[in-house]
Design a protein with these regions (language model features):
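Alpha-helical scaffold segments that flank or form the walls of functional sites
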Residues: 78-127, 131-153, 184-198
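Metal-coordinating catalytic core of metallo-dependent amide/deamination hydrolases
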Residues: 133-274
Length: 299
């Protein structure tokens, strides 16, 4: 088992219940676990160990990224979609995303993981929901390959889109899948990659993309499968007024009511964005998680 010993950490920021900041401490890491924190940990206790002198350094827990789209790192700076509201922005970019393949997803993940690690983020999720008809269904497998190679803790969410333009949704039909195909691949990924143990480096959650790109049936089926398998649920919610208008027009209810109706409220659910909730909805969401994305929503 690999071991790492950080010696003489000037400031160890614990983020524990007391928010303690410890001075001049050592940290011993064995494998993927911090096994000891203390003063003057001796090398003869640890055997063959890599030692780093942390004098003058600050050490703190790695940041955790709770919402991301790694493949989008490959599509930055496209002039046609700059400064657009969400719906036309998506419609413009779908014309590029419909050509996604395994290579693009792998390298997009490597770029994104590198940027995250460089800025102190050691755990990240990703919400990948674009599966073009021309690509294989193993795009998320490529993300796990990249995460293992670079060494980041990765929680993949198996995103999905089942409501294309022909069914009144936003995405083109070339990037949507059938409900059966989505659920079969979701179960395959859970069985192949999900590790429920403490300190796991790989986990899987289920993440239908949004109320305007999936069917009500898929939301319910995904929730049932996730709870059967013991994994979490994630989706975009209340990100724009266009989404609210879509939900009222198609379902006759606001986004939060739709989530309640499909079994998507609870401690095993976290939503992305969530900026158009009223006071009553905030009370009903108590216990569910929200990933706030200010750099996106303040554009």
């Amino acid at each position: 088992m690999s071991k790492l010993l950080l010696k003489n950490v000037d400031y160890l920021v614990t983020f524990n219940d007391k928010d303690e900041i410890l001075r001049n401490y050592d940290i011993l890491v064995e494998g993927n676990k911090i096994t000891k924190i203390g003063k003057d940990i001796q090398t003869d206790e640890t055997g063959d160990t890599e030692i780093i002198d942390a004098t003058g350094k600050v050490v703190l827990p790695g940041f955790v990224n709770t919402h991301h789209h790694l493949y989008q790192t490959m599509f930055r700076g496209i002039d046609e979609v700059q400064e657009m509201p969400l719906f036309p922005w998506l419609e413009g970019l779908y014309e590029f995303w419909k050509y996604l393949n395994e290579e693009t997803v792998y390298y997009g993940s490597m770029v994104g993981f590198s940027e995250l690690l460089k800025t102190g983020c050691t755990t990240t999720m990703d919400h990948h929901y674009v599966f073009p008809n021309t690509s294989k269904s193993t795009l998320i497998d490529e993300q796990f390959r990249a995460s293992e190679e670079i060494g980041i803790r990765f929680h993949a969410t198996r995103g999905s889109m089942s409501r294309g333009k022909e069914q009144g949704g936003l995405p083109p039909d070339s990037v949507v899948q059938s409900e059966e195909e989505i659920l079969l691949d979701s179960e395959r990924l859970i069985d192949k990659f999900h590790d429920s143990e403490d300190y796991a480096m790989k986990r899987v959650a289920l993440a239908p993309c949004s109320p305007f790109s999936v069917t009500k049936s898929l939301m319910k089926s995904s929730a049932e499968l996730a709870r059967k398998k013991g994994v979490m649920l994630h989706t975009h919610l209340a990100e724009t007024m266009d989404e609210e208008e879509f939900c009222i027009s198609v379902y006759g209810m606001r986004p939060v009511e739709l989530m309640e109706d499909t079994g998507w409220i609870g401690p095993d659910v976290w939503f992305a964005h969530g900026i158009y909730f009223n006071d009553d909805e905030l009370k009903r969401l108590k216990g569910s998680g929200i990933a706030h994305c200010p750099s996106s929503n303040m554009k």
